[in-house]
């Protein structure tokens, strides 16, 4: 069982709003501590059989044991590693939200990268329904986002002990909620060298109140007034727009969709402006799931930043 901690973030964000962002730096300790956890010398893990795919990769399913302070549940991973032995540049894939969404949604992209010498870790994240208040937790998705960041950090801890991963060259790819979690991860963890954000939200606590984007409006209309206020207050400290400045010096690439039914253009623009250099962006003629052009572009960008070419 994960504990609820996100409400403690709000007072610290006053400092964040006043911080000098002229120079690249990670989030200050008083903010980063809310994504902390008990680190162990080793991360206990159980691996399955290796599925070798000719001319491609070795695929292995792993489970990381919960950590001692119960801030992280068991973490399920899929590792897709090049056939050649040695430490490889590594991509950490963080999937979007959705009842049927799994880490396997990135398998084909990861296999293609493995053929080029890049290893991948696909993480099963703790959110299924978009913007969903779980049980009696008023924080709802806020707790799930924080838990996803902790899971990603523990995954990197484990990867550092493995022979197939070069932890000095790590890129994070996140889609929707995965992009939200990826932004927070890059803001606090210096191990992230590159960050690719697919259809990321920018300031959901603000834009969800006024947007006419179809999916966002339907979601807003499903709340009563009291629930809505509680929900917005819980996610506000985690708005990516507040944190993206701390991703630097990691390279950041934004993949936006012109037909995004959650996030409108002004929210995309504000998020991009809040990021520090080095950064780049591309708008794709697609819905928020993006298209084949975006997939090809991801592969090119990841190879460029991880191989330095």
Language model feature labels by segment:
Residues 39-85:
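N-terminal cap/lid segment of alpha/beta-hydrolase-fold proteins
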Residues 76-77, 87-96:
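Short beta-strand element of the alpha/beta-hydrolase
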Residues 94, 98-150, 208-214:
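Cap/lid segment of the alpha/beta-hydrolase catalytic domain
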Residues 137-176:
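Gly/Ser-rich "nucleophile elbow"/oxyanion-hole loop immediately N-terminal to the catalytic nucleophile
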Residues 183-229, 247:
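Hydrolase active-site cap/lid region
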Residues 247-248, 253-256:
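Short beta-strand/loop motif that positions the catalytic acidic residue
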Residues 258-263, 288-289:
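Acidic catalytic loop of the alpha/beta-hydrolase fold
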Residues 264-272:
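Short alpha-helix in the alpha/beta-hydrolase fold that links the catalytic acid
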């Amino acid at each position: 069982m994960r504990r609820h901690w996100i409400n403690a973030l709000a007072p610290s964000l006053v400092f964040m709003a006043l911080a000098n962002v002229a120079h690249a730096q990670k989030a200050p300790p008083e903010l980063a501590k809310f994504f902390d956890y008990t680190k162990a010398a080793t991360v206990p893990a159980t691996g399955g059989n290796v599925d070798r795919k000719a001319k491609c990769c070795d695929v292995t399913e792993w489970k990381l044991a919960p950590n001692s302070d119960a801030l992280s549940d068991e973490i399920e991973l899929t590792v897709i590693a090049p056939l050649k032995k040695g430490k490889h540049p590594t991509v950490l894939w963080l999937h979007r939200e959705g009842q049927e969404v799994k880490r396997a949604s990135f398998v084909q992209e990861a296999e293609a990268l493995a053929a080029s010498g890049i290893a991948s870790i696909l993480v099963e994240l703790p959110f299924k329904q978009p913007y969903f208040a779980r049980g009696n937790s008023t924080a709802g998705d806020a707790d799930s986002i924080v838990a996803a960041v902790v899971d990603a950090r523990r995954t990197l801890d484990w990867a550092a002990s493995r022979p197939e991963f070069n932890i000095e060259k790590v890129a994070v790819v996140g889609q929707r909620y995965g992009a939200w979690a990826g932004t927070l991860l890059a803001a606090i963890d210096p191990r992230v060298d590159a960050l690719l954000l697919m259809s990321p939200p920018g300031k959901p606590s603000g834009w969800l109140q006024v947007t006419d984007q179809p999916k966002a409006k339907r979601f807003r209309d499903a709340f009563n007034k009291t629930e809505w206020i509680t929900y917005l207050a819980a996610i506000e400290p985690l708005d990516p727009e507040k944190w993206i400045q701390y991703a630097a010096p990691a390279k950041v690439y934004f993949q936006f969709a012109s037909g995004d039914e959650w996030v409108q253009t002004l929210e995309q623009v504000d998020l991009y402006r809040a990021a520090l250099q080095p950064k780049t962006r591309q708008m794709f003629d697609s819905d928020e799931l993006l298209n084949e052009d975006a997939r090809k572009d991801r592969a090119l960008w990841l190879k460029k930043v991880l191989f330095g070419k």
